[in-house]
């Protein structure tokens, strides 16, 4: 599966547009509790534990995006956009949302 943030793929011709696809992952409040408990991981203003959880959420969202594109018969996703949103009561959860257009090249 080819993934790209650009609307076209250099050297490839988009033969068919299959539709918009989305992948999402939400980190719950317990993750943030664990992250803040591990505040000692912060070195130089960065939290290794927090970054690891964000990477895991991104991976889950990308996997979901690819599964949905494949279900539409696509072999690529173009125009990918990644958004991070704080959601839930008093910002207790973080949502990673990835969207793009499933295409056949």
From Swiss-Prot:
InterPro entries: UPF0145_dom_sf, UPF0145_YbjQ-like. It comes from the Bacteria. It holds the Pfam family YbjQ_1. HAMAP family: UPF0145. Belongs to the UPF0145 family. This is UPF0145 protein AHA_2580.
């Amino acid at each position: 599966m080819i993934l790209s943030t650009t609307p076209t793929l250099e050297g490839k011709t988009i033969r068919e547009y299959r539709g918009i696809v989305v992948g999402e992952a939400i980190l719950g409040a317990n993750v943030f509790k664990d992250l803040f408990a591990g505040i000692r991981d912060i070195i130089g203003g960065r939290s290794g534990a927090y970054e690891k959880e964000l990477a895991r959420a991104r991976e889950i969202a990308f996997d979901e995006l690819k599964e949905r594109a494949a279900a539409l018969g696509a072999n690529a996703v173009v125009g990918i956009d990644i958004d991070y949103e704080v959601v839930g009561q008093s910002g207790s959860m973080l949502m990673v949302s990835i969207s793009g257009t499933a295409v056949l090249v």
